[in-house]
């Protein structure tokens, strides 16, 4: 199952597809697929490198 990161609050969660609203902040956001697809993170869970690289609103403040 894919992992997603909210563009607003940075929340990372597992779901078949991104929801309409973030389960953490409740906002309508863009969701980035941060699933692990490489050997470095074992092809499972989320990729910490992708989580660190994807922007979110809170990191811009």
From Swiss-Prot:
InterPro entries (UniProt xref): Rubredoxin-like_dom, RUBY_RBDX
Question: Pfam families under this entry?
Answer: RUBY_RBDX
PROSITE patterns cross-referenced by the UniProt entry: RUBREDOXIN_LIKE (PS50903)
Rubredoxin-like domain boundaries:
1-46
User: Molecular function terms in GO for this entry?
Assistant: iron ion binding
Please give the name of this protein: Uncharacterized protein MJ0737
Species source reads: Methanocaldococcus jannaschii (strain ATCC 43067 / DSM 2661 / JAL-1 / JCM 10045 / NBRC 100440) (Methanococcus jannaschii)
């Amino acid at each position: 199952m894919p992992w997603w990161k909210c563009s607003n609050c940075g929340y990372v969660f597992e779901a078949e597809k991104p929801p309409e609203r973030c389960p953490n902040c409740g906002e309508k956001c863009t969701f980035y697929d941060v699933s692990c697809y490489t050997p470095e993170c074992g092809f499972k869970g989320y990729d910490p490198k992708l989580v660190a690289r994807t922007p979110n609103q809170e990191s811009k403040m």
